[in-house]
């Protein structure tokens, strides 16, 4: 499918021992820095537009830097930021490089707290100023805050408006920056609360500072800050005084995992990242529950605390279908089941002619679902063989057994993805010609005009790649029929929690439904839905419902599929094409513990999601449909 930009990746490490401990046990005081690099590289799939890292050095002397940050843009950002950090060590002697005490006192990025972030922009904004972590500085260590996260907030407009009403003038319009300012303000209040308490105990000077740093409660800061936000998020932060936290949204939309022992506390967006980096079993890695925060105090005391009541069970199902790496043991099985569950509709599509059907997949994220599909067809053929043998009225001969048992699933590597072709040629026909060559095929892999070709993808969003590249190149093999299978259901609604698909008109399913309404003289339903959405937008977001769902009600999945085929069929192509989508029921059966399916069903977990969906339909009508 078209590559989707999606939620970012986070990584955090808190060392619980002095640097000398890691030098002695692991041969380097850079243990955490090296592990952070591995954690970020293992999550490169989550962000290729930029990366950043930050470090806090505990116990730094006044006049010496204790917070360090590097950020960079581009696909090589991870290598670049670690290259910059390591450049500080290139002129050291071997003795200095092995001296943890020297490193602690003199070197940048020789600290106890580390944070990393990989960025994918889903807002269209670019520039180094949008790359995490964001940093808020102050002369008081406890008031310094470094923030990063995997999130998209739906109510930034409302919060921005509230801030400007108060007389504030935020320098950058982004959810991260606004969160940084809000959280920084609440952190200031928390520090001042402890300052007052210390003064009441008649403390003076550095005794007050030490008291503040020992008694700051980040849970108070999170409770007063995060209640204002609507969206899916994992928010991570470190303070100059040594507090560390990671909080997950109360709907459980975005994922976070952690591990702790007597040496380290670590956080990542995906479980296998921690397993591989720290050689752990899956059972040793804990999932951060919705509405809770992992908190590590300056003294290393670690706890998980509830910040907000859980508001739902809406973990993103797209994480399991597409975004997360398939190396997670549960995700691997779920993706296989998504493929296996599609056997019956595929059989129907090829008229049960398995002997003359070749199976393949669109590289690369559909590979695991493909294995599941093959497994399902192997089971189907085995059952067919058993039934054939059982129905014989005699003991089968060797030749008969060979004929029956000789049936097998014909799987081939049909599609190959070449290097990503840049659309630097602006003239339309040339660009289309370039796009058509993103994929290549294995010539001679099917029997022309005899074999059906079944090819599975993880999902179909816009349909652009199908129309401009995949269908054209597959047609060169001259199959009898092409069946394109999606392991995900039809994507019908926008996402506002971190996936780059916020406009209805981008979805081939939505465009097909609108076209069907036009062809059947049902335009009144479009206008009624428009008026209904405007009426909903006049209400508080907490009271809004989603009228956009009515657009799809007149049609079956098959009717929409047929219209999509008609719309995406390349000019001049005559080979029969059929689409097969996963059902909602099949999705829930394969992925029972991740119930966030708003892009398929229109059931948004937060009020802000429903509001923005209504706004998206209004925008479509006013900016596209009525034009």
Question: Where in this protein do the model-derived segments appear?
Answer:
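Conserved short alpha-helical segments that host acidic/polar catalytic motifs at enzyme active sites
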Residues: 1-289, 295-358, 362-363
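Amphipathic alpha-helical
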Residues: 197-216, 377-393, 400-414, 420
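Active-site proximal loops enriched in glycine and acidic residues that flank catalytic Cys/His/Asp
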Residues: 237, 248-249, 269-271, 298, ...
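Conserved hydrophobic/aromatic pocket- or pore-lining residues that grip, position, or stack substrates
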Residues: 294, 342, 359, 373, ...
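Terminal amphipathic helices with adjacent charged low-complexity linkers/tails
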Residues: 300-316, 361-395
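Extended, hydrophobic alpha-helical segments in both membrane/secreted and soluble proteins
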Residues: 359, 366-373, 377, 411, ...
């Amino acid at each position: 499918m078209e590559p989707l930009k999606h939620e970012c990746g986070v990584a955090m490490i808190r060392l619980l021992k002095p640097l000398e401990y890691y030098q002695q046990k692991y041969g380097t005081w850079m243990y955490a820095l090296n592990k952070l690099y591995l954690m970020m590289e293992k999550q490169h799939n989550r962000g290729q537009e930029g990366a950043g890292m930050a470090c806090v050095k505990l116990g730094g002397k006044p006049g010496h830097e204790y917070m360090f940050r590097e950020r960079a843009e581009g696909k090589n950002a991870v290598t670049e930021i670690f290259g910059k950090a390591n450049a500080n060590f290139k002129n050291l002697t071997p003795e200095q490089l092995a001296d943890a005490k020297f490193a602690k006192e003199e070197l940048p990025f020789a600290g106890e707290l580390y944070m990393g972030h990989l960025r994918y922009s889903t807002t269209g904004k670019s520039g180094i100023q949008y790359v995490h972590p964001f940093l808020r500085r102050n002369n008081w260590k406890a008031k310094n805050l470094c923030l990063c996260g995997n999130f998209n907030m739906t109510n930034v407009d409302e919060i921005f408006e509230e801030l400007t009403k108060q007389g504030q003038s935020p320098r950058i319009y982004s959810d991260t920056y606004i969160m940084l300012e809000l959280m920084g303000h609440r952190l200031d209040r928390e520090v001042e609360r402890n300052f007052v308490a210390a003064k009441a105990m008649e403390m003076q000077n550095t005794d007050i500072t030490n008291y503040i740093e020992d008694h700051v409660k980040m849970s108070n800061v999170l409770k007063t800050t995060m209640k204002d936000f609507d969206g899916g998020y994992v928010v991570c932060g470190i303070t100059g005084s040594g507090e560390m936290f990671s909080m997950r949204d109360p709907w459980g939309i975005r994922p976070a995992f952690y591990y702790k022992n007597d040496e380290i506390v670590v956080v990542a967006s995906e479980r296998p990242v921690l397993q591989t980096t720290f050689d752990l079993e899956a059972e040793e890695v804990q999932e951060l529950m919705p509405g809770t925060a992992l908190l590590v105090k300056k003294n290393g005391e670690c706890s998980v605390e509830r910040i907000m009541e859980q508001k739902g069970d809406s973990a993103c199902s797209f994480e399991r279908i597409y975004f997360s790496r398939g190396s997670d043991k549960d995700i691997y099985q779920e993706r296989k089941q998504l493929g296996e569950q599609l056997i019956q509709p595929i059989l129907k599509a090829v008229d049960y002619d398995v002997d003359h059907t070749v199976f393949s997949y669109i590289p690369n994220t559909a590979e695991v679902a493909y294995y599941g599909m093959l497994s399902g067809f192997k089971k189907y053929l085995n059952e067919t063989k058993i039934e054939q043998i059982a129905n014989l009225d005699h003991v089968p001969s060797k030749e008969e057994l060979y004929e029956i048992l000789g049936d097998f699933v014909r799987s081939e590597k049909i599609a190959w993805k070449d290097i990503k072709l840049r659309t630097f040629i602006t003239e339309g026909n040339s660009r289309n010609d370039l796009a058509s060559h993103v994929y290549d095929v294995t010539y001679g892999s099917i029997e022309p005009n005899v074999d059906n070709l079944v090819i599975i993808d993880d999902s179909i969003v816009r349909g652009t790649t199908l129309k401009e590249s995949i269908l054209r190149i597959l047609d060169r093999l001259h199959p009898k029929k092409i069946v394109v299978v999606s392991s995900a259901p039809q994507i019908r609604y926008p996402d506002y929690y971190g996936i780059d698909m916020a406009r209805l008109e981008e979805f081939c399913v939505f465009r097909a439904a609108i076209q069907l309404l036009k062809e059947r003289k049902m335009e009144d339903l479009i206008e009624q839905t428009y008026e209904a959405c405007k009426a909903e937008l006049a209400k508080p977001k907490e009271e809004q419902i989603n009228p956009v769902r009515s657009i799809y009600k007149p049609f079956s999945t098959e009717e929409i599929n047929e219209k999509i085929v008609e719309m995406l069929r390349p000019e001049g192509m005559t080979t029969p094409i059929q689409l097969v989508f996963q059902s909602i029921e099949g999705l829930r059966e394969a992925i029972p513990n991740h119930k966030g399916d708003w892009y398929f069903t229109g059931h948004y977990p937060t009020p802000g999601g429903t509001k923005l969906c209504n706004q998206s339909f209004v925008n479509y009508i006013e900016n596209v449909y009525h034009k």
